Amino acid sequence: MNTLRCLTQALSKSGREAPKLYQKVIFPGLFREGIPIANVKKVDEKIIDSPTSTSVNGEAKKIVRHGVKYEREQVKEYLSSLPTLTLSRKQIRDDYDEERAKRMYMFSKQTNSSNKFQKLLTAKSQEFTRELLTLLIDCTSNEKNSGPERFTRKFLKFSNDEIPPLPDFSKNPQLFENYIGILSHTKFNFRSSSKLNGIVRKMLRHLLHPTNKTTLPLRSAQVYNDSIYFFSEHFDFASCREIFAQMKAEGTKPNTITFNLLLRNVVKNSHIRKTKHPDDEVLFYLRSMRNHGVFADVITWTTCYNFLRDEVSRQLYIVQMGEHLGNFNVNFVYTVLRNGDYRAEDCLKVLAANSLPISRKTFYLCIERLLNEEQLETASKLLDYGFQHLKSNFKLDSEAMNHFMRVFANKGRSDLAFLCYNTCRKIYKIKPDSQTFEMLFKALVRNGNTKNFGAVLQYIKDLKVSEGFGLRTSYWRTKADSIFKFGSPNTLSEKSIEKARKLLGNLIASEGEFSWKIWKESDSSQKKILRFLGCIPTTLRCTNTAQDHQKPTNLPSNISQKKREYRNRVKAIATKAALEKRMAYIKDNDVAFKKELVKRRIVGEV
């Protein structure tokens, strides 16, 4: 709480950044009509035909066993075009000492519980804070800008359509930056294009390849920054560092956004369990920032706050930030609140006491904290308040819905999951994402095998398709399929599916409030829907209903075995398909890449 008081005092003395925002909207549709697309020469089909069936043996078995060997070769080929740079992944060795790692982990676990070690850690933390502040102050401009201007770009969060065609950049060089931006910021669900092994990653590697003479003069700092952002979102931090090195080698000066992204990578990487603190890496980037003459902004200061590990350091940091930067923004306040163990009530009090607008991130943080505190009713009231009164601040998106859906899915509450989905979709006009439907499948599975399990499962599938999402295989959907296939004695009829359509879409919170005691507070029409879902309190279930409402763990062992075998078969089919696709790339990467681009009409063929 001392940190919050320090923050309140700093806010009262210093200004608050209110930048003038200039926004440019960049959607995939900009590249679909009237723009000449790139062409590739026709390739020999015989060279790139992959085998019709691939057994997991021989060369394929080696690929499966080693996993990353192909990726390593691709990385080495890419980096070999940068001979002047010393990069560790040019020569990757299999020298990981597992026994040493175990010893270091046990040693770290023992020393962390030592009081002497904790004192040493605190002293080291405060020494790091002093050095961190020295570098940040050196990088901060002395000129105070009361009304900074900030240019932002707006991209679609996700798209279920194909990637826009690749423009011919020799004829339209001005499109290069925006095209890289779309590939990096919009998640293309079609054919898993934006996954780490998808086509987007291959396209970025191709467009930024050191030997690509067409795009070399078009690569600005923004292009490199967008690429760093893409690999950061996939936790490929090594590629981020390599792009940063390539950027400097090709003569492009990094800017403030570049270093902010690299520091953000360190924050994300620090959440992964390891024995070494990220202090040296943070200081390296700040020294590099100073050497390049790049100024730190409020985002740099906000990002670096995440590396502080004790209350004294945090309070000192806030005071120094107020003195040298001169202003704060709502994102910094959010970072302070997120890094502390504060209740939702404390977070809202800080905003009210300082007359700060509530941002989207802070709003979602409060909902998350309320749900962790088991205050479901209060969290749902806050969600309704956000829809009614905070429209000028931000628009609710799928993340707001998914905070609730994750809680309901973990508890197996299909009733509350459908109540939340319908309320958010129909009342709050929130568009779901793929994670939303995965939580519906999960809630259904954890609710157990009920009489109408198959009808509800089919309803979720139809609902997902109607929202523009294909029926992609996922963990909880496959698990639900296996339960219905082997654990349900009832056959799926059109009548039961039609009944599900009529009932389930009408389960809506009357006053925008969710409650764990939904059965007790429901009227007769809602109870009819809850009965259909099999969500009846245990004490009110009759014998037959209780027998129908079986959890998967209570099924006979032979049925459980059949379900496991079914899921393993689905997994094996997916693995085999992915392997066959990979085999074409292993045989000839360039030819297979061109073939896929042509087949998907991302490029033309001459």
Curated annotation (Swiss-Prot):
Keywords: Membrane, Mitochondrion, Mitochondrion inner membrane, Repeat. It is found in: Mitochondrion inner membrane. Its main location: mitochondrion. GO terms for molecular function: mRNA binding. One of its GO terms (cellular component) is mitochondrial inner membrane. One of its GO terms (biological process) is mitochondrial translational initiation. It is a peripheral membrane protein. InterPro entries: Pentatricopeptide_rpt, PPR-containing_protein, TPR-like_helical_dom_sf. It comes from the Eukaryota. PPR repeats lie at residues 220-254, 397-432, 433-467. Gene3D superfamilies: Tetratricopeptide repeat domain. Present with 1760 molecules/cell in log phase SD medium. Required for respiration. Stabilizes the mitochondrial bicistronic mRNA encoding ATP6 and ATP8, 2 subunits of the proton-translocating ATP synthase. This is ATPase expression protein 3. The gene is AEP3.
